[in-house]
């Protein structure tokens, strides 16, 4: 299934390392949500310039995916906190200011990782791409959550937890990411956009 296993797993390990660094950063500075938001916003503007504005072929699909993920994520966060399913700590508001930026970066992170991993698949069929997307959306965001949960950023109150992350949260994370991926797939199909990840 994989042409170069060493490179494939090296990219995944590099991705996990990025999550660890981000999780520790948010965990240690959780009470300074404004400053975290500012730093994450700067990172987003850097990514937009580097990946969308500067290149000759503009990848507007990436920006659409980032905005859709942000919208879906914040709707879910608002619903979850309002219903008492989880709670953020050490902030003066229900939702920390950095949250929308974290959702935007989550899409960018998964998309860029898939861009590196898909060329390493022997069979680049839609089925294999979907399987890879499901696997990454199931494992990696939850891995980042485990770190921040253990550093006291938030607490889930749902049952059936694995390292502080409940089964329902795994399902919600996959749902948001796969819904965005499905929308982007149909955008690519309708407007005949050639994208390694979505078609």
Go through each PLM region and give its residues.
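Aromatic-rich, lipid-facing transmembrane alpha helices and their immediate juxtamembrane interface loops
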Residues: 1-199
